UniProtKB/Swiss-Prot annotation:
The gene is speE. HAMAP family: Spermidine_synth. S-methyl-5'-thioadenosine binds at residues 33, 108, 140-141, 165. Gene3D superfamilies: Spermidine synthase, tetramerisation domain (2.30.140.10), Vaccinia Virus protein VP39 (3.40.50.150). InterPro entries: PABS, PABS_CS, SAM-dependent_MTases_sf, Spermi_synthase, Spermidine_synt_N, Spermidine_synt_N_sf. CDD domains: AdoMet_MTases. It comes from Enterobacter sp. (strain 638). This is Polyamine aminopropyltransferase. The active site is at 158 (proton acceptor). It comes from the Bacteria.
Length: 289
């Protein structure tokens, strides 16, 4: 890969997207993944793993705000948060904005990703790696949730697509481990791809998660970087009230945090759980309300 070329995403065989590469900042295969970080005039710095875009400076705030503030504000009194993946540091950045959080644990399989991102994506982590509440664990996420003695109020799986090393974070073993690590009333969320193009992933996750959690559904956000439509996030908890909280309740909690967001707001929070009919039909009407 050289400067002034075009980088093509390889997630889909029959269609896809490309980025003009203005400047390659880093490109090397780590022990686990093929990682590249380059600059693009429209999206800023772009990071891709194994031919799939993971994040861009231009729109990462949408993904990370929705992955953090939705479960944290729905929970209402979370103190201990676990992030699986998230090596770019942006998920940590958003969680750390909640001053009521007491501990933030991040489990990343590849120490190299953390090092690269601290150097090349500083706006993503915005200094959050230095938060005294933060602990970094270099380990496989499945192993951690099945072996750890720690428990958490919210678990955020900032996983890659279910290919390569990221595939293990879509298995029953991982979901079962997350359930054992959650405190009563806890919430698990995970990225689940663009459901219009990756519907089988949502169906598979829904089926597996339903073995361990009483309330399983999805919520969504429109993120331009992720080609093909609206991004889907898995939602799992045993407290079915949390998914149906009113906008007024969420707004009161949001006001108490003094957060200023660029995408998330209480109305977006409640609207995000309204799923398109094709996804409801795929999951079956009896399973989604």
């Amino acid at each position: 890969m050289t400067d002034n070329t075009v980088w093509h995403e390889t997630l889909h065989d029959q269609f896809g997207q490309y980025f003009a590469v203005d400047n390659v900042l880093y490109h090397e295969k780590t022990d686990h993944q093929d990682l590249i970080i380059f600059e693009n005039a429209a999206f800023g710095r772009v990071m891709a793993l194994d031919g799939v875009v993971q994040t861009t400076e231009r729109d990462e705030f949408i993904y990370h705000e929705m992955m953090t503030h939705v479960p944290l504000l729905a929970h209402g009194h979370a103190k201990h948060v676990l992030i699986i993946g998230g090596g770019d540091g942006a998920m940590l950045r958003e969680v750390s904005r909640h001053k009521s959080i007491e501990t933030i644990t991040m489990v990343e399989i590849d120490a190299g990703v953390v090092s690269f991102c601290r150097q090349y994506l500083p706006n993503h982590n915005a200094g959050s790696y230095d938060d005294p509440r933060f602990t970094l664990v270099i380990d496989d996420g499945v192993n951690f949730v099945n072996q750890s003695h720690q428990t958490f109020d919210v678990i955020i799986s900032d996983c890659t697509d279910p290919i390569g090393p990221g595939a293990t974070l879509f298995t029953s073993s991982f979901y079962e481990g997350c359930k054992r690590c959650l405190n009563p009333g806890g919430i698990f969320v995970a990225q689940n791809g663009v459901c219009f193009l990756q519907q089988d992933e949502a169906i598979d996750s829904h089926r597996k998660l339903s073995h361990y959690f009483g309330d399983v559904s999805f919520y969504q956000a429109a993120i331009p970087t992720y080609y093909g439509g609206i991004m889907t996030f898995a939602w799992a908890t045993d407290n079915d009230v949390l998914r149906h909280l009113s906008t007024e309740i969420i707004a009161a909690r949001f006001h108490q945090t003094h957060l200023k967001c660029r995408y998330y707001n209480p109305a977006v929070h409640t609207a995000a759980f309204a799923l398109p009919q094709y996804l409801q039909d795929a999951l079956s009407p009896k399973e989604v309300s």
